[in-house]
């Protein structure tokens, strides 16, 4: 007897439809109007290793300024919808809005090339594991005064939101009751925005040294209590809308100069099957926690990423250079100009004629010099229903800045309305104050650069503007002096040639 039964195979339903992310070129129309904008000379001076507090309260503290810090410039642009446009018929303010598109950038760097070093007067360095005749097994204080030259890094990231950094921090154990004092803490990958003044990866890794190294002597002074961040290129490249990184330039260089091991008790003992026990001084193996000293090697002008223009034709993400909210975030690192100045002053009113180190004070300072130049293209956005719906899904605050708002749903409740609003017989009828617009990056540190009054249409009056006109093959018209008249056109027909007649004598 035949019996029907359902199939044992699984039935797979199609996945739900996902909203498609489109490129900004699909709904942003570019015009032929370009503007130049540039900052003034940007300078900063400070101590390269730590912040110096000033006693008395009259003077401000000396900030920490190091070549191994991120410089994150928050560039503020004027609102193009409130801008003086040369062509009034360029767009319709009732159905369109204007936005800026960054098409060119040049980051200028002053100061000569140089190598700066950092160090620690009590660096945890036990043995020279490269050339040591034997390993020390004592747990005495073997810290030494050591200095290193960090990894060489050049970096430039541009976007309309801050760049994202990653580092390893102290995680939370699943069973905290089973964690004993002295156990290795769990690690957790943390993503945070890169702020101005954050330390870069110097060759010791991207991690929270203050939380994971309690000896305060495993790394140099400037990072022993800091968080070193590394740009999360994977996350920024996978950004849905492509706002965090239009494009990036980077160059890293590193090699290991010296090889040491760490002092202290080894937390993870070497398994016995990995070695044969020795005798005498080899009876107990030394520390197996090894570490190199990083070095960035030679600095040369042949490998410079700065002081040259870059043109953005196609971004790596869906945002092709559109500056939403009229702002840009420029993240810069340049360790090829990391020279630290050494200053010396006499503690006496007159400089001693004989050198005595106890009569002089030594100081160290680091200086940085920047110059930012941009080329912006004026663009229009036609406010159709689909475009406004897409922008509202992407970032609703963009429409708020354009004075568009979503109508609230109708209220089913009855609203009370008093007749005499100023009467003392009723409660106060003052309207609630309108909520202030909150900065989404409030609490984050950036180097603010205001370009709202530094836009110009005269591109040929500025260095980057002339470079842009050259690469765009735009011929500049003369503004003064006589202009050459066009040459008269010549007839294609050739002049009639007269034949010579041969006359017989």
From Swiss-Prot:
Biological process annotations from GO: endocytosis involved in viral entry into host cell; virion attachment to host cell
Compartment(s) where it occurs, according to its Swiss-Prot or TrEMBL record: Virion; Host nucleus
UniProt-annotated stretches for the region Disordered: 118-143, 475-505
Keywords of this entry: Capsid protein, Disulfide bond, Host nucleus, Host-virus interaction, Late protein, T=7 icosahedral capsid protein, Viral attachment to host cell, Viral penetration into host cytoplasm, Virion, Virus endocytosis by host, Virus entry into host cell
Domain of life the protein comes from: Viruses
Keyword hit for Disulfide bond: yes
GO cellular component, one term: host cell nucleus
Gene3D superfamilies: Major capsid L1 (late) superfamily, Papillomavirus
Pfam families xref list: Late_protein_L1
Coiled-coil ranges from the UniProt annotation: none
GO molecular function per UniProt: structural molecule activity
Basic residues biased stretches: 475-486, 496-505
InterPro entries in UniProt: Capsid_L1_Papillomavir, Capsid_L1_sf_Papillomavir, dsDNA_vir_gr_I_capsid
Family: Belongs to the papillomaviridae L1 protein family.
Subunit structure, interactors included: Self-assembles into homopentamers. The capsid has an icosahedral symmetry and consists of 72 capsomers, with each capsomer being a pentamer of L1. Interacts with the minor capsid protein L2; this interaction is necessary for viral genome encapsidation. Interacts with protein E2; this interaction enhances E2-dependent replication and transcription activation.
Function: Forms an icosahedral capsid with a T=7 symmetry and a 50 nm diameter. The capsid is composed of 72 pentamers linked to each other by disulfide bonds and associated with L2 proteins. Binds to heparan sulfate proteoglycans on cell surface of basal layer keratinocytes to provide initial virion attachment. This binding mediates a conformational change in the virus capsid that facilitates efficient infection. The virion enters the host cell via endocytosis. During virus trafficking, L1 protein dissociates from the viral DNA and the genomic DNA is released to the host nucleus.
Protein name (Swiss-Prot/TrEMBL): Major capsid protein L1
Originating species: Human papillomavirus 39
Lineage: Viruses, Monodnaviria, Shotokuvirae, Cossaviricota, Papovaviricetes
């Amino acid at each position: 007897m035949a019996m029907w039964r359902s199939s044992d195979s699984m039935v797979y339903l199609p996945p739900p439809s996902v909203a498609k992310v489109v490129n900004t070129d699909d709904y942003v129309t570019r015009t032929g109007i370009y503007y130049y904008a540039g900052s003034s000379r940007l300078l900063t001076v400070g101590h390269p290793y730590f912040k110096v507090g000033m006693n008395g309260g009259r003077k401000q503290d000396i900030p920490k300024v190091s070549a191994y810090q991120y410089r994150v410039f928050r560039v503020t642009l004027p609102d193009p919808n409130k801008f003086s446009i040369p062509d009034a018929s360029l767009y319709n303010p009732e159905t369109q809005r204007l936005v800026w598109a960054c098409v060119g950038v040049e980051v200028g760097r002053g100061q000569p090339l140089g190598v700066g070093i950092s160090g620690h007067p009590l660096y945890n360095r036990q043995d020279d594991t490269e050339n040591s005749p034997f390993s020390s097994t004592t747990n005495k204080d073997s810290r030494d005064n050591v200095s290193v030259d960090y990894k060489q890094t050049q970096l430039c990231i541009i976007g309309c939101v801050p760049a994202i950094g990653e580092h390893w921090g102290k995680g939370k154990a699943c069973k905290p009751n089973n964690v004993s004092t002295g156990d290795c803490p769990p690690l957790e990958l943390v993503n945070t925005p890169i702020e101005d003044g954050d330390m870069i990866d110097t060759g010791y890794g991207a991690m929270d040294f203050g939380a994971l190294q309690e000896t305060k002597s495993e790394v140099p002074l400037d990072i022993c209590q800091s968080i070193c961040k590394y740009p999360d290129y994977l996350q920024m490249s996978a950004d849905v809308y492509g706002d965090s990184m239009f494009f990036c330039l980077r160059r890293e260089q590193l090699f290991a100069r010296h090889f040491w091991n760490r002092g202290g008790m080894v937390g993870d003992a070497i398994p016995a099957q990995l070695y044969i026990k020795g005798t005498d001084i080899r009876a107990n193996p030394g520390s197996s926690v090894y570490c190199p000293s990083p070095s960035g090697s030679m600095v040369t002008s042949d490998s410079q990423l700065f002081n040259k223009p870059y043109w953005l034709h196609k971004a790596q993400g869906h945002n092709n250079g559109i500056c939403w909210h009229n702002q840009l975030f420029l993240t810069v690192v340049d360790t090829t100009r990391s020279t630290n100045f050494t200053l010396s002053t006499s503690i006496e009113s007159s400089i001693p004629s004989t050198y005595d180190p106890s009569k002089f004070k030594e100081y160290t300072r680091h200086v940085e010099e920047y110059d930012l130049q941009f080329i912006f293209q004026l663009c229009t956005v036609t406010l159709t229903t689909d475009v406004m719906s897409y922008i509202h899904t992407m970032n609703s605050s963009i429409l708020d800045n354009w004075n568009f708002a979503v109508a609230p749903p109708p209220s089913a409740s009855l609203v009370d309305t008093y007749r005499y609003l100023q009467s003392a017989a009723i409660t106060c009828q003052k309207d609630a104050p309108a909520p202030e617009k909150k900065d989404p990056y409030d609490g984050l540190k950036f180097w603010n650069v205001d370009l709202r009054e530094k836009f110009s249409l005269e591109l040929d009056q500025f260095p980057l503007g002339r470079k842009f006109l050259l690469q765009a093959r735009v011929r500049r018209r003369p503004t003064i002096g006589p202009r050459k008249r066009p040459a008269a056109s010549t007839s294609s027909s050739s002049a009639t040639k007269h034949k010579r007649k041969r006359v017989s004598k």
